[in-house]
From Swiss-Prot:
This is Secretoglobin family 2A member 2. GO terms for molecular function: protein-containing complex binding; steroid binding. Glycans are attached at residue 35. SUPFAM superfamilies: Uteroglobin-like. Highly expressed in ventral prostate. GO terms for biological process: androgen receptor signaling pathway. It comes from Rattus norvegicus. One of its GO terms (cellular component) is extracellular space. Keywords: Glycoprotein, Lipid-binding, Secreted, Signal, Steroid-binding. Induction: Androgen dependent, as shown by the decrease in the level of the protein following castration. Belongs to the secretoglobin family. Lipophilin subfamily. Residues 1-18 form the signal peptide.
Length: 95
């Protein structure tokens, strides 16, 4: 299950360009996702505009809880991975 959530997070930036994701809203959601000090309640307030139904809300809660269950080192590594993706050649903004 953890691998599924990780792949979900990894596929988000495929549509984005530039340093970071190039999308401030996406960057904020990713930071909230991998930040262990962001509570489930605060995270749900952050993503509320994008949660349209009860099923999505339940999935988002499980998604965040997965990250809350990880060690700080694992969360730090996810952040490093996201930066590597955003700074990769395939994610660079065209000149």
């Amino acid at each position: 299950m953890k691998l599924v959530f990780l792949f979900l997070l990894v596929t988000i930036p495929i549509c984005c360009y530039a340093s970071g994701s190039g999308c401030s809203i996406l960057d904020e959601v990713i930071r909230g996702t991998i930040n262990s000090t962001v509570t489930l309640h605060d995270y749900m307030k952050l993503v509320k505009p994008y949660v349209q139904d009860h099923f999505t809300e339940k999935a988002v809660k499980q998604f965040k809880q997965c990250f809350l269950d990880q060690t700080d080192k694992t969360l730090e590594n996810v952040g490093v991975m996201m930066e590597a993706i955003f700074n990769s050649e395939s994610c660079q903004q065209p000149s």
